[in-house]
UniProtKB/Swiss-Prot annotation:
This protein's GO CC annotations: cytoplasm
Annotated InterPro entries: Dimeric_a/b-barrel, L-rhamnose_mutarotase, Rham/fucose_mutarotase
Record-listed substrate binding positions: 19, 45, 80-81
Gene3D superfamilies: 3.30.70.100
Keyword set includes tRNA-binding: no
Enzyme class, UniProt record, top EC level: isomerase
Catalytic activity, EC: 5.1.3.32
Alphabetized SUPFAM superfamilies for the sequence: Dimeric alpha+beta barrel
Subunit (UniProt): Homodimer.
Protein name as it appears in the record: L-rhamnose mutarotase
GO molecular function, one term: L-rhamnose mutarotase activity
Amino acid sequence: MTVRLGQIMHVNPNYYDEYEKRHSDLPVKFPEMKKALKEAGAHNYSIYLDKKTGTLFAYLEVDDMDKYKAIAEMDACKEWWAYMAPLMDTNPDKSPVTFDLPEVFHLD
């Protein structure tokens, strides 16, 4: 069953362009990360930025939540987190601070 996820994160001021650039470079610099997301059935993945506040809104659909959650233990993911950490609010393990949002409406 496909699960729809919505999350809020924060990118630090003055790093908006760099945040976007690093995501554009993900398929080339971090192909293992892209592969892991695809293998977990992640699709329809988008991240939006509110440049007034630095708030990021991520939306994605995941076909296998167990595989998706396991990505956090992969070296490729930890390297990605370390690469992105200077730009964002992060936890001690360098993972981004995220807030999961409950879905309150959906229209197919």
